Swiss-Prot record:
Binding site for thiamine diphosphate: 73, 114-116, 146-147, 174, 285, 366
Species whose genome carries this gene: Moorella thermoacetica (strain ATCC 39073 / JCM 9320)
Assembly and interaction partners: Homodimer.
Keywords for the protein's UniProt record, in alphabetical order: Isoprene biosynthesis, Magnesium, Metal-binding, Thiamine biosynthesis, Thiamine pyrophosphate, Transferase
Record has Lipid metabolism as a keyword: no
Listed name of the protein: 1-deoxy-D-xylulose-5-phosphate synthase
Enzyme Commission number: 2.2.1.7
Gene name, Swiss-Prot/TrEMBL: dxs
Amino acid sequence: MSLLEKINEPAAIKKFTLAELDILAREIRQELVQTVARTGGHLAPNLGVVELTLALHSVFDLPRDKIIWDVGHQCYVHKILTGRRQEMTSLRQFGGLSGFPKRAESPYDAFDTGHSSTSISAALGMALARDLKGEDYQVVAVIGDGALTGGMAFEAMNHAGHLQANLIVVLNDNEMSIAPPVGGLAAYLSRLRTDPMYSRGKEELENLLNRLPHLGPRVLKVIDRLKDSFKYLVVPGMFFEEIGFTYLGPIEGHNIARLKEVLQHARNTRGPVLVHVITTKGKGYQPAEDHPDRFHGIGPFDPATGEPLAGGGPPTYTSVFGAELVRQGEKNNRLVAITAAMPDGTGLTPFARRFPKRFFDVGIAEQHALTLAAGLAAAGMHPVVAIYSTFLQRAIDQVIHDIALMELPVVLAIDRAGLVGEDGETHQGLFDVSLLRCVPGLVLMAPKDEQELRHMLVTALQYQGPAALRYPRGAGMGVPLTGTAQPLPIGKGEVLRRGRDVTILALGPLAYAALEAAGDLAARGIEATVINPRFIKPLDEDLILTWADRTGHLVTVEEHVLAGGFGSAVLELLARNGRKGIRVRCLGVKDEFVHQGKPAILREHLGLTPAGIRAAVQALLAETPVLHRRRNQTKGISGG
């Protein structure tokens, strides 16, 4: 029996020897590789925190003590140790385990995460609640060096240092973003500062010197001055000390004995403590160590080689956007591109290579990214901010206050709009339309395919104000990418198919699902008009009202929440224009969060498939007698 099979609860590992914990770490790595090879997921981050997670579970008493995993994608080892090992085959699958911590899933998950830089704020809140209620437990936030670039993390640390709250922050430094220690002396000083004997010895020395008349206090002052100067020279954690944290580290993050020793010391230290741990992303699996970025988040792969199993197919929307942006950059030397720590994910890497001086990666700082773009635009440049829909949520005030109020020409390229799939509710791009549709002067578009995406990028770049285009994750529709991208007339949709019984307004690539549904309906004697709206704001009001009058029935379809979404915009249009007799059904996401699963499965679950659209049309028409429908259709179907 393997050691891993002996673990029914995390307390079991407290009895393991250090040698057994090292063996357990190897077993966990092997299981991680095999599991993620089947399900896909965040492999490299989890391989890097195996020993750290074992040490945390050895020192702290979960679930009484609380561990909050920043971002949360590095929680797989934690899930294995907390009774979910048998369910790991369902990781990130529909109805299975989430790829992130989830309070509803386990009492061992103290706080839901998915976005970056939130853990320290949450940990501080829990620590304050503990103290106000007179309870006694430890609160630990585990945050990566990348997440520490987020301003929210520093806001929380500043507040924690001011309050001198009892909490522990573990800095998982896996890319050496923070300066490494300087030589053996720094390591020696770090060793002293993590040893409980250091604090006691320092106090005893001070007491001894204070008993010496005249000489003692003077020596202490000299020692303090030397100590302060010395610390800034050789210890890389003095920033944290200055804001009120006790800094412990840097620590070898794959040495379980050392990790346990330091974490125990942190547990016994009053006030906020930062434990700086150096880890290797992808540790123990050579392909992931060689290519940690590629294995940060990966689909199913061959564990023997590390090569992805899936391949081929149409280019992704992201890659088409990136290629077109480079073409536009060749024509316009005022065009600049901005990302918030996602150059590969947003398709900006080719632009960065071609125009390094016109590319800016701001780190995990979405608010700064948007206002940086505003400043660039105000000074005569034309910025494009490529950002995931879910992360744009963090910078809506900047869109309104810093961009739209001044009508600045900033382009928002909103990637991962709609259902993103296996990353689940924290990453679905289902709120951007509601958030942006209300912003005065902003143009909002959604392409039906990758060719139209090219045209919309050019349209956005030619618009003299804020413009946004939202497009999904994954492969395009496979349409030919031909010719030079041309601007589209703003606020004009297109009719893809004409019919007399019902009008289907399908946003983005769902236009193709609507066309398929229309074909199925035609076989059943129902004639449907299918419209690609193209523009969510401004709507093509004439086109929509014309076809609403002709057919008397509208179905809107969108990969977005219904509240405040595209369907809401259509309903508002009808109400403003007194179209009380038009019957409407809106398809989209109701008042719920959408959990993880493959996008195709999620669309089926939500009724956003050809079959779902067909059923919605049939249900809508069933509410109105055929004779009454025909009498109300007083206009022909030509034109429009």
